[in-house]
Design a protein with these regions (language model features):
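Small/aliphatic-rich secondary-structure junction motif
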Residues: 3-50
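Short secondary-structure boundary segments
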Residues: 38-40, 105-107, 135
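A short acidic, glycine-rich active-site loop
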Residues: 53-65
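Short beta->alpha linker loops
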Residues: 62, 81-85, 135
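General small-molecule cofactor/ligand-binding pocket signal
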Residues: 35-37, 78-82, 132
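Short, flexible loop segments at boundaries between secondary-structure elements
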Residues: 126-135
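Glycine-rich, Arg-bearing micro-motifs that act as flexible, cationic patches
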Residues: 104-126
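Structural beta-alpha unit
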Residues: 71-102, 109
Length: 135
């Protein structure tokens, strides 16, 4: 079905990513690739100066370690960590890497989502490829 599947995972995820990876295994072609992606939120310079010098590097390394644990044991599965803003970074990454399916986890929408919009909602609205939403 799909040749290149993207699974965005929050660096601080407490949800089990197994459901997303299991779905990817079902909908993938035999030679397709799965990419687990974490976005470390960009910290503006006026805030970053209050953090330890190596904080962003530490955040990226920690995210890579968590993603690698999730990816272990799955064929043609790679990981990537980028710094940016979640929804925009997911959409840009999908476009640049010719992703044809995004599997995104979502929570039940709350009152604030109607004003702010969740990452999943923004990805669904603006993606140029198929999007599967897991609850």
């Amino acid at each position: 079905m799909y040749k290149s599947i993207l699974i965005p995972i929050a660096p601080d995820h407490q949800r089990d990513t197994k459901a997303a990876i299991d779905l990817a295994e079902i909908i993938r072609d035999k030679d397709s690739k799965i990419t687990l992606l974490s976005i470390v939120e960009f910290v503006p310079p006026y805030i970053a100066q209050q953090l330890p010098d190596d904080q962003m590097t530490k955040n990226v390394v920690d995210a890579k370690v968590k993603l690698q644990e999730d990816a272990d044991g799955h064929r043609n599965t790679s990981i990537d960590v980028i710094v940016g803003h979640s929804a925009n970074s997911i959409l840009d990454y999908a476009e640049k890497n010719e992703i044809d399916c995004i599997i995104v986890a979502s929570h039940r929408p709350g009152y604030q989502d109607y004003f702010l919009g969740s990452t999943a909602a923004r990805v669904v609205r603006h993606a140029t490829c198929a999007v599967h939403v897991l609850r």
